[in-house]
Design a protein with these regions (language model features):
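Alpha/beta-hydrolase active-site loop
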Residues: 132-187
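Gly/Ala-rich beta-loop-alpha elbow adjacent to hydrolase catalytic centers
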Residues: 198-203, 207
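Alpha/beta-hydrolase fold nucleophile elbow
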Residues: 185-199
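Bacterial N-terminal signal peptides
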Residues: 9-17
Length: 356
């Protein structure tokens, strides 16, 4: 049962200085109303927020691991000391608080919902693989709608609904954080136009697949998208093509198999600038959407894969310990989407029509 505090919150026409405009249904700019501005980090289990949720052990989508530890813990953070941009990053991969700290420093809200992402090692094992198998599962995992015969993920267990339920909980639990801004006027969903959908590797691939279906503020794909045998990348997109951004290391195996060049071009990202090596240029990187790095990872392709997000594999200044790609992350998540580079031709050496 929802708390009285929660019900009152949803009933109010404004939340902490966030007023609805009755003439057009849009909202004014988000402003924090926090008497003690600070950084907030919040956690909640999906199964405790929404009683409709269920585990799906057949795809290792469960509430607890083999040792009984909670597996459905969701993370969120916001820094009310920083002027808010009114954008919510939904992160589709393992929680990375260092990344969330960076996002919060840009004035972004960030959450990591618990959603189905371990099916990759279980499903779509036929060879040759169907060109729609993984893409359809990704979409069902994200939406909770029936797109695949391989899985059965209902609405309460899809990323969309779990994110919505989480933000509702955050709005009640942490009103100082202004989370209610991201709820629709009627309180029935998220304002997806203000959502930045993002992830790394497998998660970035699902993020891009979801953005084909649902219009979002932007997509940030770190070391992705992958799926070189799938065709969803060339489908019509609800999210405008100029809103897709990607960043990867040249030694990442995704380049060896043409995952990245293929996905980036099929998504239309070449229409907004060339591939730019961020180690040789400064922001705004020719306003492009396709960024790479070639910093020394001692030939380690696994480190290369994870090096494009904050963490131990990332490039740091040897003296100060500061991240060398901080400007890149800021660009990826905050660069104006309407500021675009000049279109370039497709790379004919990148194999787009791949078969097993």
């Amino acid at each position: 049962m929802m708390s009285s505090r929660y019900l009152i919150l949803l009933a109010l026409p404004f939340v902490l200085g966030i007023a609805a405009n009755p003439s057009c249904g849009e909202s004014v700019a988000l402003k924090f109303n926090d008497p003690k501005p600070q950084k907030y980090q919040l956690t909640a289990r999906a199964s405790e927020i929404d009683a409709r949720t269920k585990p799906h052990s057949e795809i290792d989508f469960v509430f607890a691991n083999e040792k009984g530890a909670p597996a459905d813990v969701q993370k969120a953070s916001v820094d009310t000391q920083v002027p808010p941009r009114g954008k919510l990053v939904i992160w589709l991969m393992g929680h990375n608080q260092t990344l969330f700290d960076q996002l919060n420093s840009y004035g972004l809200h960030a959450i990591q919902p618990h959603y189905a992402n371990k099916w990759f090692a279980i499903c779509c094992k036929d060879k040759p693989i169907s060109e729609h198998c993984r893409g359809n599962i990704r979409l069902e995992a994200a939406t909770g709608q029936d797109f695949s015969d391989e899985v059965d993920i209902p609405k309460p267990d899809g990323m969309m609904e779990r994110s919505f339920q989480f933000v509702q909980w955050l709005a009640a639990e942490n009103p100082q954080g202004g989370w209610g801004y991201f709820l629709t006027k009627d309180g029935t969903g998220l304002r997806w136009e203000d959502v930045i959908i993002s992830g790394s590797s497998h998660g970035s691939t699902t993020a891009a697949r979801f953005a084909k279906f649902q219009k979002v503020s932007r997509v940030v794909a770190l070391c992705g998208p992958r799926d070189q045998f799938q065709t969803w990348q060339s489908l019509p997109s609800a999210t405008p093509e100029n809103r897709y951004f990607g960043f990867s290391h040249v030694l990442d195996s995704g380049w060896t198999a043409d995952h990245y060049c293929r996905s980036w071009e099929l998504l239309g990202m070449h229409k907004f600038g060339p591939i730019v090596n961020v180690d040789n240029q400064r922001p705004p990187f020719q306003n492009t959407r396709r960024l790479i790095t070639s910093f020394d990872v001692n030939g380690d392709d696994k480190r290369a894969h994870s090096s494009v997000q904050p963490g131990r594999s990332a490039w740091k200044d040897a003296k100060t310990g500061e991240y060398m790609h901080e400007d890149v992350w800021r660009y990826l998540y905050t660069h104006p989407v309407d500021a675009v580079g000049k279109a370039v031709p497709r790379d004919e050496s990148c194999i787009k029509n791949q078969k097993q």
